[in-house]
């Protein structure tokens, strides 16, 4: 089981990668939504804001008003962010949960 710090570090790496991709591509994704990530086996959550292809303001705690919600175990979250776990297959099998409206899901797919 990954630790809370490992999950936080993985999410920060994801935010840095998204920031670099948004800066280098010049192709802004029109998505401005609050995002929350719940780590089921640790009982913790993180939240931030997806804006222009970037994940900003990542902090500890849940955001009950999040329009995009990711749910995963600590190991699955770290593996997904490290590229060791296929997001689409994990979501289809129910290993990782993503709650968002269908249009946001299509935009998220471009970011991942």
What are these regions (language model features)?
Residues 1-112:
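Feature captures hydrophobic
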